[in-house]
């Protein structure tokens, strides 16, 4: 099996975009993990929907803001696909957190199931975009 080819170096414009996105990204990963853990703790330990709501509300606000921040970045044409993947991930994380909050209101378990699927898809989108923007980055998923 031949070694994987080295990714091409980013242009100055691409590097500026990647650095701007990194400022958002470094908050995305812990927020996504916190959202997952809040759901796990609810399911396995507390079954306290009020506590779940208190944990998810700030995460939902973060993802709404992150989606707007990512959407507002100036994107080089060469990175439009990666940008689209990342922006879709932010939308999915926002929708997932909204689903979890909906669960705290009506108790409909389908909200949690849907949120889990959205979170997984968002994580995959971020990994794909990250391969282009930050090749070689440690991926804990």
Sequence positions of predicted segments:
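Amphipathic, hydrophobic N-terminal targeting peptides for secretion and organelle import
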Residues: 1-5
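Alpha-helical segments in soluble extracytoplasmic regions
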Residues: 6-85, 89, 97, 104, ...
């Amino acid at each position: 099996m031949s070694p994987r080819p080295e990714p091409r170096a980013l242009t100055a414009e691409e590097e500026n975009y990647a650095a701007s996105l990194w400022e958002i990204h470094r908050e995305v990963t812990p927020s996504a993990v916190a959202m997952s853990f809040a759901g796990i703790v609810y399911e396995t330990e507390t079954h306290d929907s009020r506590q779940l709501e208190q944990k998810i509300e700030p995460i939902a606000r973060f993802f709404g803001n992150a989606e707007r921040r990512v959407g507002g970045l100036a994107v080089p044409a060469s990175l439009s696909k990666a940008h689209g993947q990342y922006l879709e991930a932010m939308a999915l994380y926002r929708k997932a957190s909204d689903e979890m909050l909906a669960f705290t209101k009506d108790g409909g378990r389908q909200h949690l199931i849907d949120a889990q699927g959205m979170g997984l898809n968002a994580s995959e989108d971020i990994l794909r975009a990250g391969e282009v923007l930050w090749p070689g980055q440690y991926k804990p998923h």
